[in-house]
């Protein structure tokens, strides 16, 4: 057996990336954003092809991400922010609902969304993870944008029965 294997592609040239950053826990979000933008540049994404918007908090990420995804102007999106545990149940609500919204947007629109919302117990944990998570999200966005493009069905106007692009060379005899 010789399967067709798509390898990770971290070439960001020509990609359009949208970033939505939650302003709550501003210092953490800024560190994430800076690391994310630096990594996107290293991966070849032109700064003119990146749009950054900010929203008040993690629960508002979904609305902005949905609007950006629905515009189909972006190859991938990135959500950045931090939810730090407090003394109430609010932490669980914000963590769960923001993660669910991010996943739902990606699945419903087919636009990859890298989830960079940190969910941590302390400010120190968030600070320690912020830059790394921002850079990771840049890599995830580029890789998933390229994967989504590679998996996009090609329109073949000339011959719908052309099987040159099939993964296996065996003819289907209808059985």
Swiss-Prot record:
MF-aspect GO terms: 6,7-dimethyl-8-ribityllumazine synthase activity
Family: Belongs to the DMRL synthase family.
Species per Swiss-Prot/TrEMBL record: Bordetella parapertussis (strain 12822 / ATCC BAA-587 / NCTC 13253)
Pathway where this protein functions: Cofactor biosynthesis; riboflavin biosynthesis; riboflavin from 2-hydroxy-3-oxobutyl phosphate and 5-amino-6-(D-ribitylamino)uracil: step 1/2
Positions contributing to 5-amino-6-(D-ribitylamino)uracil binding: 24, 58-60, 82-84, 115
Keyword Transferase (UniProt): yes
PANTHER family for the chain: 6,7-DIMETHYL-8-RIBITYLLUMAZINE SYNTHASE, 6,7-DIMETHYL-8-RIBITYLLUMAZINE SYNTHASE DMRL SYNTHASE LUMAZINE SYNTHASE
Active site per the UniProt annotation: 90 (proton donor)
InterPro entries: LS, LS/RS, LS/RS_sf
Reactions catalysed: (2S)-2-hydroxy-3-oxobutyl phosphate + 5-amino-6-(D-ribitylamino)uracil = 6,7-dimethyl-8-(1-D-ribityl)lumazine + phosphate + 2 H2O + H(+)
Keywords (A to Z) from UniProt: Riboflavin biosynthesis, Transferase
Binding site for (2S)-2-hydroxy-3-oxobutyl phosphate: 87-88, 129
The protein, known as: 6,7-dimethyl-8-ribityllumazine synthase
Job of this protein: Catalyzes the formation of 6,7-dimethyl-8-ribityllumazine by condensation of 5-amino-6-(D-ribitylamino)uracil with 3,4-dihydroxy-2-butanone 4-phosphate. This is the penultimate step in the biosynthesis of riboflavin.
């Amino acid at each position: 057996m010789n399967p067709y294997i798509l390898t990770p592609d971290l070439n960001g040239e020509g990609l359009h990336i949208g970033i939505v950053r939650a302003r709550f826990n501003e210092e953490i979000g800024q560190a994430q954003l800076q690391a994310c933008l630096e990594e996107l540049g290293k991966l070849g994404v032109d700064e003119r092809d990146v749009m950054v918007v900010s929203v008040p908090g993690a629960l508002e990420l979904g609305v902005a991400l949905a609007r950006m995804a629905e515009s189909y102007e972006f190859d991938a999106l990135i959500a950045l922010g931090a939810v730090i545990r407090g003394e109430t149940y609010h932490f669980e609500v914000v963590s769960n609902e923001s993660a669910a919204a991010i996943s739902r947007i990606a699945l419903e629109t087919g636009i990859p969304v890298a989830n960079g919302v940190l969910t941590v117990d302390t400010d120190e944990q968030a600070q320690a993870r912020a830059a790394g998570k921002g850079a990771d999200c840049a890599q995830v966005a580029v890789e998933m944008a390229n994967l989504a493009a590679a998996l996009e069905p090609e329109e073949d106007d000339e011959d719908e029965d052309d099987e040159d692009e099939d993964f296996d060379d065996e003819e289907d005899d209808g059985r």
